[in-house]
Curated annotation (Swiss-Prot):
Species this protein is from: Anaplasma phagocytophilum (strain HZ)
A GO biological-process term: translation
Described function: Binds directly to 23S ribosomal RNA and is necessary for the in vitro assembly process of the 50S ribosomal subunit. It is not involved in the protein synthesizing functions of that subunit.
Protein name per its UniProtKB record: Large ribosomal subunit protein bL20
Keyword rRNA-binding carried by entry: yes
MF GO annotations: rRNA binding; structural constituent of ribosome
One GO CC annotation: ribosome
Record-stated family: Belongs to the bacterial ribosomal protein bL20 family.
Key words of the record: Ribonucleoprotein, Ribosomal protein, RNA-binding, rRNA-binding
Top-level taxon of the source organism: Bacteria
InterPro entries, per the entry: Ribosomal_bL20, RIBOSOMAL_L20_CS, Ribosomal_protein_bL20_C
Length: 128
């Protein structure tokens, strides 16, 4: 049987790692061992932060909804409770977008949510 030398596969593996590490600073972009370590850490961060991004966006949506609901005298929890009582099928992402882009529609939802909770909706005067 012929002897198998691993030079070709090793070179290919090293090239792949170096290509993925393109754009890194220092030795991490062209030294295989440093690039491999940096790449493993980068992929671990990417995996972790893909999950963290979902939490971050949900927090952002809640902050935006709370701020917009506050203009109508409602707390976030009261607003969301009223929305669920009214069977309004909008998720937090859509409600947050409406709070930013379509204030008129959000106002109608806020009034409906306030009525469902048995609260009176107070419209705050805005300076803008």
């Amino acid at each position: 049987m012929a002897r198998v030398k691993r030079g070709v596969t090793t070179r290919a593996r090293h090239k792949k790692v170096i290509a993925l590490a393109k754009g890194y600073r220092g030795r991490s972009k062209n030294c295989y061992r440093a690039a491999l370590q940096r790449l493993e850490k980068a992929l671990a961060y990417a995996y972790r932060d893909r999950r963290a991004r979902k939490r971050d966006f949900r927090s952002l949506w809640i902050v935006r909804i709370n701020a917009a609901a506050g203009l109508y005298g409602l707390r976030y929890s009261e607003f969301m409770h009223g929305v669920s009582l009214c069977s309004i099928g909008l998720n937090r992402k859509m409600l947050a977008e409406m709070a930013v882009r379509d204030k008129g529609a959000f106002e109608k939802i806020a009034h409906a949510a306030a009525q469902a909770c048995g609260r009176t909706c107070v419209v705050a005067q805005s300076n803008s």
